[in-house]
A protein has these predicted regions:
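Low-complexity, acidic/Ser/Thr- and charged residue-rich accessory regions of DNA metabolism proteins
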Residues: 2-4, 24, 38, 252-257, ...
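Noncatalytic, basic helical substrate-engagement surface that gates or grips nucleic-acid strands
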Residues: 2-139, 154-169, 265, 271-272, ...
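Single, functionally critical "micro-switch" positions that shape active/binding sites
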Residues: 10, 145, 212
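Alpha-helical elements of the RecA-like P-loop NTPase motor core of helicases
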Residues: 124, 150-151, 218-219
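Long, highly charged, low-complexity intrinsically disordered interaction regions
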Residues: 129-130, 142-208
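Accessory alpha-helical DNA-binding modules that contact the DNA backbone or grooves
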Residues: 189-273
Length: 326
């Protein structure tokens, strides 16, 4: 029997990359070029996921954004200039589309939330949100191909809480299927060790010990939850199966290993931050109609809003409205 989820988390940038293409059709709106078709595809995709996997009456939807272009990955960029380098070279319309998705989402549905904060990535939000807001009997499905999100996979039988991850090609990762696929449990430190040693091409994180034997890795994660202790014990000969060759490799890679660990570690976010940054959304058809008319997309993906009265325009609607960027 398939699970009906009452909490759905969307990695917005991750999904956006899936619906856009290099030759995206663009429409001139004022002085901006807007990827209208991609915006429509984004909401068709997310609406389809909610309809297929979400509980009809009480599904809470969480839209988690990475940073805007002007501040993207600032904290981690200070550590490594190549961090997520492959994600920065995007045309202006890409970010115009993201901003428009945020604006539409704000008025698109009740019982939904936006998180978008400078210098905070989407995967930084997931664990604290689950820790602070997911309750007994809740079922969570996270939509992201980012392995960092797998650190939150959970099957708590005592509290009847399940957290699964939809990755790609209709694959839903569970704690069990992750372990079958990768050979280890998806705990926070285990995934951090995996990415620290073997790298992560999607985030431009360089491998440090790409040929480290799997049995050595499994022993490592069974004994250590922090890379600094692992490095110290390896260099002091306390990991007895490591020969001189491996100790030299670890010594030469130690600085990069510490850097990788910082890059893959979550930011420290507490409940006060979450409450302060949370943007509660609400369905407001009049607001949506103004946006849809400006973009000429009335009826494209949202059949609820009809073009009965064009009302104001997008610029006047936005007068006085600001989106906090902490």
């Amino acid at each position: 029997m398939s699970i009906i989820y009452n909490n759905i988390f969307f990695d917005v940038y991750n999904l956006w990359y899936r619906v856009v293409n290099k030759n995206e059709s663009l429409t001139d709106i004022g002085d901006k070029k807007v990827p209208i078709d991609a915006i429509c595809k984004f909401f068709e995709l997310t609406d389809g996921y909610i309809k297929k996997y979400g509980s009809v009456e009480n599904c809470r939807v969480w839209y988690l954004f990475d940073n805007a272009k002007t501040s993207m990955m600032k904290n981690r960029k200070l550590l490594d200039k190549d961090y997520k380098k492959n994600r920065e070279i995007q045309p202006d319309w890409f970010y115009v589309g993201i901003n428009m998705i945020e604006l539409i989402t704000k008025y698109y549905r009740d019982n939904s939330v936006i998180y978008r904060v400078q210098n905070v990535e989407a995967d930084d939000f997931v664990a604290p949100l689950i820790d602070n807001y997911i309750n007994e009997h809740d079922k969570v499905l996270m939509f992201s191909t980012d392995m960092d999100w797998s650190r939150c996979l959970l099957n708590d039988t005592e509290r009847d809480v399940v957290v699964n991850q939809y990755t790609r090609n209709n694959e839903i990762l569970t704690v069990k299927s992750f372990e079958e696929k990768f050979g280890f449990k998806p705990t926070y430190s285990n995934v951090c060790f995996w990415k620290t040693l073997y790298g992560d091409q999607s985030d431009c994180i360089l491998p440090t010990l790409s040929n480290y034997p799997k049995q050595y890795f499994l022993d490592c994660i069974s004994k250590y939850t922090d890379v600094s202790r692992f490095i110290s014990d390896a260099l002091n000969g306390k990991i007895t199966y490591l020969d001189a060759g491996w100790r030299i490799k670890i010594k030469n890679s130690a600085e990069r290993m510490m850097l990788n660990w910082q890059l893959v570690s979550n930011l420290d976010i507490d409940n006060f931050d979450l409450e302060n940054w949370k943007v509660e959304c609400a369905y407001k058809p009049n607001k949506l109609l103004i946006i849809y008319n400006t973009l000429n997309i009335v009826g494209r993906f949202d059949k609820r809003v009809k073009n009965e009265n064009k009302g104001s325009d997008l610029l006047s609607m936005l007068e006085g409205e600001t989106v906090e960027r902490v």
